[in-house]
Every structure is written in C-alpha cells, then in structure tokens.
Amino acid sequence: MRKSYKYNIKCEKKIINQIILKSKNYSFSSVLLSNYNLHKPNMPEKYISYDCIAAFDMIDTLLSNSNSFEKLSVFHNNKKDWLFGSLSYDLKNELEQLSSNNNDGVFAPDLFFFVPKYVLLLKDKNDAENELSILKAT
C-alpha cells in the first residue's frame, strides 16, 4: 500500500538535478529520465507518461544467479508493487544453452530488483508547471 502526495512545481531541470543528488544518499536508488524532448517531433505523446521516475530506499530485494525469471515472477506476484532493478548480460545463459562468464567489475548478480520505499513521478503539465507525485510505502 502506498500513500500518494502531489505537488505542482516549477523548474523541472532543477528538480531533476535535486533528485539525482538525493539518490546518492541511498544505498538503493534508481533514476529514469525520459528522452521524449529529444524525439518530440517523432514520438506520439501518448507513449510518454513521465519525464522522470525515481525510486529511493528499499523495502525488499531480489538477487539471483539461477532460475532468475522464475524467482522474479514469484517476487512480483508476492509484492504486487513497483520494482526497479537490472539484468546482467550473462542472464542470457539461463535462456539458451550458452556459456559466458563476463566480469562486470562490480560483482553484480545476474538479476537484481528492489521494492522502493519512495517512488517519485515527475510529469510536465505545461510549459510553466510540472506535477511531482511522491508515492510512499506504508
């Protein structure tokens, strides 16, 4: 369950910079920025919902190096909440009979997802105003 807070704000770039800086204070964070402005003439607006989606802090995590997609499915079905994470290149070895063991330099698992405590959604409403929604886990 999440409690929602909405704010009308100005200066989207300033807010995005603050979100990125704030992400450094958490062990678990993810900041996703839209490239809609780069492709505005070519991309229908209905395909773009948010200019920025960010996740901070962690309620639960999933790390896997085997049977990863099955574990992700169970994790998702149990949590029924926002998930942020990453997939490694070597995860392909679980899909086909392939073998590689690429060193990523940070010893990340093949699959990693977390349920964030906070989700921030930033949407451009018009040229002068933006809407920031904060979804806090309760």
What are these regions (language model features)?
Residues M1-T138:
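Signature of the chorismate-utilizing enzyme
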